[in-house]
């Protein structure tokens, strides 16, 4: 019997068949943005529905030299109580499913927790190189298996330097991400439709969209024109 995910309208909880794996390697996701000045309005909208938790992290985007490239995100809590933590989230992001009928992005996603005092050396040993890094500060809201994360993005003017004089805000808007994680062989369409329904409740404050970001990320550079 195939693994099946049933997402109910009330609690949005997964009901998995007996032989399903608890390890979640699929992700349905939507993206949006909201002006920072309007974030309190979004939080008030979410307050009656969601349980919140603080999130403040530094993220590094890496890729391999393989074709197609392997994309990894390294994330850790940043300067918690004046200490930099050595626990990292290592997140692999695959190429999204080419399903035009699905109302959300569906992609392979594998997350692991790693403890390392020199994570970048480990990443380099995997054949990864850093594309860019940024610092996020925001809140994570959850209800059942739905997660909403809103965060502001900050970059450092000098790599490896994170004092206040070296940090610069990237935008006057906050990034909003809403997602559901699923087992690998689960049918994703019911969860995707449920996620779309919840996302519509956030309008008109924020319009959550199925962004075709991968068309740029995974595109092959065009060969230079001959003269």
Swiss-Prot record:
PANTHER family: MEDIATOR OF RNA POLYMERASE II TRANSCRIPTION SUBUNIT 18, MEDIATOR OF RNA POLYMERASE II TRANSCRIPTION, SUBUNIT 18. Component of the Mediator complex, a coactivator involved in the regulated transcription of nearly all RNA polymerase II-dependent genes. Mediator functions as a bridge to convey information from gene-specific regulatory proteins to the basal RNA polymerase II transcription machinery. Mediator is recruited to promoters by direct interactions with regulatory proteins and serves as a scaffold for the assembly of a functional preinitiation complex with RNA polymerase II and the general transcription factors. One of its GO terms (biological process) is positive regulation of transcription initiation by RNA polymerase II. The lineage of its organism: Eukaryota, Metazoa, Ecdysozoa, Nematoda, Chromadorea. Its main location: nucleus. InterPro entries: Mediator_Med18. Belongs to the Mediator complex subunit 18 family. Keywords: Activator, Nucleus, Transcription, Transcription regulation. GO terms for molecular function: transcription coregulator activity. GO terms for cellular component: core mediator complex; mediator complex. Component of the Mediator complex. The keyword Transcription applies. It comes from the Eukaryota. It is found in: Nucleus. This is Mediator of RNA polymerase II transcription subunit 18.
């Amino acid at each position: 019997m195939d693994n099946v995910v049933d997402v109910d309208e009330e609690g949005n909880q997964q009901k998995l068949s007996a032989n399903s794996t608890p390890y979640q390697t699929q992700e349905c996701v939507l993206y949006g943005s909201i002006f920072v000045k309007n974030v309190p309005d979004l939080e008030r909208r979410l307050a009656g529905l969601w349980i919140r938790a603080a999130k403040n992290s530094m993220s590094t985007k890496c890729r391999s030299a393989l074709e197609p490239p392997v994309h990894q995100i390294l994330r850790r809590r940043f300067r918690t109580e004046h200490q930099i933590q050595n626990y990292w989230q290592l997140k692999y992001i695959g190429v999204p499913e080419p399903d035009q009928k699905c109302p959300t992005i569906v992609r392979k996603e594998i997350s692991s927790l790693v403890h390392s005092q020199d994570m970048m050396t480990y990443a380099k040993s995997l054949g990864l190189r850093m594309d860019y890094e940024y610092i996020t500060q925001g809140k994570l809201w959850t209800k059942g298996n739905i997660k909403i994360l809103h965060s502001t993005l900050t970059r450092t003017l000098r790599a490896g330097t994170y004092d206040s004089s070296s940090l610069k805000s990237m935008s006057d808007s906050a990034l909003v991400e809403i997602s559901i994680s699923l087992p690998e062989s689960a049918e994703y369409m019911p969860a995707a439709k449920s996620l779309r329904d919840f996302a519509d409740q956030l309008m008109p404050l924020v319009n959550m969209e199925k962004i075709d970001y991968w068309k740029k990320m995974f595109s092959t550079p065009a060969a230079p024109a001959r003269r």
